[in-house]
Amino acid sequence: KIKYEVIAKQIEKTGEAQVSTTDPDSRALLIHGQVVEIAYNTQAAVDDKHKLVVATQTLNRNDRNALYNAVKEVQANLEQTDFTVLADKGYNNAKEIDNTQKAGVTTIVAQQEIVNSNAKGTTPDYLVTKFTYNKENDTYTCPENHTLRSTGTLHTKHRDYSSHKFKKYRTPACKTCPVKHLCTVRVEGREIERGEFAEAMELNTKNYKEQYALYRKRQE
């Protein structure tokens, strides 16, 4: 019991979600599928022109939280701030992408599969990608031309070692909408979430779609 109390205090003190008693620097990492191993995660950034490794890192976290630190190391090693980074979908983390863009780097990170909070009962024509965001008045317009508004309340989600804030958008028009059954099974109607790093993600998505041929070069 004393042993576990000591470990609990260590976790509380460091703020880490886990600790390894055999190798303090390692962590339980999802390797592939549902396979978890106590391990490290090695990162390497390669220059496209000369095919040389320009930065390396050994981490005890997965790819989702690795992009920005890798980019900073590349900037320091090359003494260059403006370049384009190509990364697979394992690096698709809104906060990491936002920080990377703010550092002056163009991001082309592969997209995750579309995850919709109301996926059950949502047909393709009513996926969240079919809703238009209106930056001028901070609203969304649905495929049926109804306006979804937010109360302005910021909610928080936690994942892995990070968290992010987001707002929820709804419209009372859902209650009488004749195609509601195609859009959502929620009794209250459709709900759209917009994260604090949404603009960075939208820019990355635009880059990915417009420069997909360039992204494919990382697979060569």
Q: How should these model regions be labeled?
A:
Residues K1-E220:
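Anion-binding and metal-coordination hotspots
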